[in-house]
């Protein structure tokens, strides 16, 4: 990330972080004497213990270990704790608490090549989602311009497919700025080549509407065959609508073309 962009991001996130207050610490309690770690242990030891406890289903111990490690500045523990709050995983779901911790990670920044880069980028994307929709009954209001900026930074600097996809969707709908179909197509193509089936489907829908009926339907059909279960319902609805509008000839051509279309292939 360029220095100017990172400084701007830190300022924006710091402002919201100050507005909502510091991360709340949960009630402290001692680890089991046989755990092999204490709250005085090093941050990485606490993180490893927390990860092991989480995988074993002892999520209360994982939260405790992550909290202590986070207080010692361990980015991975902050990220894990934020995710647990965001999804209500082992703790009561608390989007505001998750937002605060993601903000701390983004505010801290990351050095080029750092092992913390993945946590940092995940925090950017999570913050973008919160800014996009806001958090009801909290000081965190929807800020579509900020959401678009965060997606752009994650998409352009780090090449993350999900950020590229979400940025493209905002460009198509005009969320947080003007509509720009050409830029949206560029980002959809990049996300598709980075393995994002949803981006492949939406790209196909865009060019279908532009008049490239067979090719657009082919992309949607290929995406439907390669997507994750959670994306299947909306991709299927989109593909079926396009299929119903296409001619019989275009349908046959699209089915044939789709068999040679694969994620991450440069087949456009």
From Swiss-Prot:
A Gene Ontology BP annotation from the UniProt entry: polysaccharide biosynthetic process
Keyword Kinase: no
One Pfam family per UniProt: Sel1
Disulfide bonds: none
Sorted UniProt keywords: Exopolysaccharide synthesis, Signal
Signal sequence extent: 1-22
Task performed by this protein: Negatively modulates exopolysaccharide (EPS) biosynthesis.
PANTHER family from the UniProt entry: ERAD-ASSOCIATED E3 UBIQUITIN-PROTEIN LIGASE COMPONENT HRD3 (PTHR11102:SF160), SEL-1-LIKE PROTEIN (PTHR11102)
NCBIfam families registered for this protein in UniProt: TransRegExoR
Protein name per its UniProtKB record: Exopolysaccharide production negative regulator
Gene transcribed to yield this protein: exoR
